[in-house]
Amino acid sequence: MKRILTLWAAMGMVYVALEVLFRGRSHPSMLIVGGLCGVLVGAINQIPRFYRAPVVLQAVIGALIVLVVEFVSGCVLNLWLGLNVWDYSNQPGNVLGQICPAFALLWFFIMPLAIWAEDTARWLIWAYDSAVYGRGGKPPDTPYSLKSVYGDFFHGR
């Protein structure tokens, strides 16, 4: 549980920082929502069935995860509590102003970055943790590169 909460906090902080960088502002709730998305997206390649799944498939699943979390949290934060954290009602194809096709596509293309960031955070935090790699087990010397993830993404690997 401690590992999940650590990743949740790390990924939430990364999300808030990116939102401030690109939007100029964020909301405290985005620490929770962004962290949840990071943990759930990171969980994709923790499932044995997806260990070697193509990055494109992981990106599709990840984008769907983010859309579901965004929709549910948007309904709670924006519609129910009236916090007005975001509003996509002026976007074509929006659903209750909480999600829209344009941002779904954006999440799809951002997903390789999210996958890489979560895997890199795991590597940085637990690189030499024997509980993760077993007694005497050794992690890779460095995490894989963001360039290689996008290379696999655009080549369908």
Where are these regions (language model features)?
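Aromatic-rich, lipid-facing transmembrane alpha helices and their immediate juxtamembrane interface loops
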Residues: M1-R157
